[in-house]
Amino acid sequence: MHKYILLLLTVILLNACSAADMQSPALQPTLPPPTSMPTRSEAAFTTAIPDKTAIPLPAGTPFRLPYSELAATAELADLATSAQPDTEIEVDKVAALSAALQRPPRDQVELARALGGVTDASAVARTTPLDVQVGDVEQFWVTSTATNRTYTVTAELRYAGPVALMYVEQGLIIDQATLEQAARVFEEQIYPRTRELFGSELQPGVDGDLRITILNGRSPGGGVAGYFSSRDSVPSSVNRFSNEREMFFMNIESVNPANPSYLQVLAHEFQHMIHWNEQRNAAIWFNEGCSTLSEDLNGFVTHSFVMAYLANPNTQLTAWSEVPERAIAHYGAANLFMRYIYTHYTGEEGLVDLIRANAGNNPDAFVELAARTRPDITSFGTLFADWALANVLNDPHLADGRYSYPTGPDEPEWLPTTVKPRLLNIGTTDNTVYQFGVNYYALPDGPLTVEFDGATSVSLVGTEPHGTYAWWSGRGDNSVSTLTHPVNLEGLDSAVLQFDTWYELEKHYDYAFVSVSVDDGTTWQTLAGMHTTNEDPHGANYGNGLNGVSGAPGVDTRSGIRGSWVTETMELSAYIGQPILLRFWQISDDAFNAPGLLIDNIRICSNTVADQCVLEDDVEAGYGDWQAEGFARIDGELPQTWELRLIHTGADGDLSVRNIPTDSAGQATIRLGTNERAILVVAATTPHTTEPASYQLRIQ
């Protein structure tokens, strides 16, 4: 997803409107009861794919386990034992990293004061409500995700209600009665329902007005049905592209107020607006999971996202892709996981608590919640494995019902089909699985032996430090990490900063900066270097930023090209003769984050006197005088953890789920007797990384 906004992709949005739709007679849309089945069928809608090739969805009869009906009894075996590293040292390494990588939320106002030179930046643009009337014409900033361009449109206020202000871009033809009816459904049904479930939007907000602005316009190039952008919720002095309103944009070329899909997108985007207020640095996967669940609980239960995931379960739940075609499966994973959490653990009352606990970045919040019902759930890996099993079994009668999506007479079918495992034969299979992704294997009938040999470590970002250690910025959405060191430049006649760096940062949206402060950290000036840019298409570059992929100028992270280590040099002679603070920053906006920034071999020396240096740090000796907030000193690897489950059918037809622990070498052995059958579920569960885990299966 190549933008700072949270959006719903048109590539899989159902019922996208055509030009003819826009002038069709007004439909009187009404919502069904919040948790009941939608009043429309999936077959009634078409899939809009503007300039894209959609991921093919599974066709034919939904797959069910061939032996599920044979289960006369079931047992829950060994689930208290997780497949975690055997040594406390390895566990402590992950825990220490998790503690270090607590990146604070991105405060755009504070950043404008510190880095943007806006010393009088305010959090609000006005304190009294907007003085607007139907018929008023305003200009708005709009971003095209296809062209990566921000531009202005002129729009007319067509509806002003107690909750919503509906603007329509000039030149678009939308039936007035249809627009007003959609606005009233939002005000009377979607607005209160979504607030009840997820919390409140910022009120009165940047514009001093309790009402939400909804701009209906065109998005050149397509690719988006609607978006919420947090930059609109700050004054234009903070971001020059801000519309200074709590608002979202609706792409009328994709969704029409006459169709239910328009209301579906409103439910989706309104949750994003609420989520931003309740938890500023929420992880995108959890945020999008809540928005797709908001669609469900507002009565719009569709399965396109979910079907894409079930066709490709080796998709990392806890990550995202900025490539639209790949993001489809991530939407499905997030939606399905939140359906599972909702039906088993939160109900309607517990969702906002997860948001406020920042569960997407703090998965222990999920564990603490689930353990109240099932005390054997002691890790996010265990909970994830339960969900993975539900996606292949969906059997409420097995064990205590955790391997299913509970439903009732007034509730929808949350899981439209189940995962189809890959059939394995006798022999050796080498494969990889993404962290918090899943591979499913249908094993040959017994008797047989399966030997699993999994990696014991995984790269944190896809490269290694120059020596043993380097500084890593961490990664996260809408968040900031800093690394600060005092430096005394007195006695030098010149000074140059030099360091080695590696970075992969979302192009045009996420930046790293090197800066100097001479007023004890109140304000900062960014430094220009050989690899920095002053381009700023979206108001996110505070002067001279590192951006894109190191060693590959002009390349963005969507290309698949990986970064390489480069040496950066920055002039400090303007600051000689005084003490300064040196600070590295990494600042990410909403919606997507790449692996981040590595720093190594930091030196500040005279460029005229040999060996006259005031700072030399190869990061090997420890933290020293560095103050890290969100940065961590890393060796480039983490222990690889595994969750293996065996869905076992005995010769007598009894079905059970068994945990298969791995040893300290990442190995496990499984034996099936005569006439025994099984499905092996393989999940990698190392946090903080998006690098896949490798393993080998040997069947004999």
Please annotate each region the language model reported.
Residues D21-M22, Q28, P32-L57, T61, ...:
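Beta/coil-rich, acidic/histidine-enriched accessory regions frequently appended to metallopeptidases
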Residues G560-A594:
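Terminal, low-complexity interaction segments
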Residues M1-A100, Q108-R113, G117-D120, R126-T128, ...:
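Intrinsically disordered, low-complexity Ser/Thr/Pro-rich tracts
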Residues R231-N243, P260, Q264, Q279-Y345, ...:
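Acidic/His/Gly-enriched intrinsically disordered linker/tail segments
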Residues A495-Y503, I580-I587, L680:
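Extracellular beta-strand-rich recognition modules
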Residues Q525-A574, I660-S664:
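Extracellular carbohydrate recognition and processing domains
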Residues L172, A470-S481, L505, V555-S564:
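Extracellular beta-rich ligand/substrate-recognition surface
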Residues Y159-C290, N298-V323:
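Juxtacatalytic substrate-recognition/specificity segment
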